[in-house]
């Protein structure tokens, strides 16, 4: 197994996203920000693949999708300049969780309106998603991708933001300087979410 330090982090083109869609869909199959609004579905993995095809395509077109090595891991770091266009592209995507949810997407819309409303008004870089190939986990690849995004945020003198529903990831992100600034349960019985911010390096 290659050490993370041996892997280059490179921007991903839209025509290169297929293996990263697979890696990320598998990693997010139990992520409640997507799984809870989906509800009862016979093939949640296929839905996650469709969701991340839209997410990764939008990020790649904006120069915001990064990979470590040859699809060993992927991170979507959304810059403040790209944020509006990123969300506009997603709103036109009709093949993911919202489209296939058992309630027609009502939970998805309600949850994500709440999530985005918890984001700070200040300009920031957002870690929209991060995933590592299961065969390559625990080798530092996730940290490599996080550090890459934080370096871009630091170059702009801006904070970085993320959210997670996985409590074990809160201390993990804390190792990179992220601190919880808000925590709460999503509306309508939605999942517990931790919102974290990492200030720019001094």
Model-assigned labels for residue ranges:
Residues 1-18:
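Conserved N-terminal entry element of GNAT/NAT acetyltransferase domains
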Residues 41-64:
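Active-site rim helix/loop that mediates acceptor-substrate recognition in acyltransferases
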Residues 57-77:
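Conserved beta-hairpin
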Residues 74-131, 137, 187-191:
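Conserved acyl-donor/pantetheine-binding loop and adjacent beta-alpha core of acyl/acetyltransferases
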Residues 123-125, 152-165:
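Conserved GNAT acetyl-CoA-binding A-motif
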Residues 128-137, 161-170, 187-191, 197-200:
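Conserved beta-strand-loop-alpha-helix junction that forms the acyl-donor binding cleft
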Residues 132, 138-151:
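Conserved acetyl-CoA-binding loop-helix of GNAT-fold acetyltransferases
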Residues 143, 155-157, 166-183, 189-190:
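Conserved active-site alpha-helix within GNAT-family acetyltransferase domains
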């Amino acid at each position: 197994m290659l050490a993370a330090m041996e892997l280059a982090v490179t921007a991903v083109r839209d025509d290169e996203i297929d293996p990263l869609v697979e890696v990320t869909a598998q990693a997010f199959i139990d992520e409640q920000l997507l799984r809870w609004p989906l509800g009862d579905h016979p093939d949640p993995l296929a839905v996650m693949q469709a969701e991340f095809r839209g997410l990764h395509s939008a990020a790649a077109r904006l120069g915001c999708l990064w990979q470590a090595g040859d699809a060993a891991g992927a991170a979507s770091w959304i810059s403040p300049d790209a944020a509006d266009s990123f969300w506009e592209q997603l709103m036109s995507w009709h093949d993911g969780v919202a489209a296939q949810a058992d309630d027609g997407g009502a939970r998805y819309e309600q949850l994500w309106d709440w999530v985005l409303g918890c984001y700070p008004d200040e300009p920031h870089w957002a870690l929209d998603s991060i995933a590592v190939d299961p065969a390559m986990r625990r080798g530092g690849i996730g940290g490599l991708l996080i550090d890459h995004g934080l370096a871009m945020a630091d170059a702009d003198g801006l904070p970085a933001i993320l959210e997670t529903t996985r409590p074990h990831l809160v201390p993990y992100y804390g190792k990179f300087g992220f601190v919880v600034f808000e925590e709460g349960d999503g509306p309508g019985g939605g999942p517990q979410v931790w919102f974290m911010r990492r200030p720019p390096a001094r």
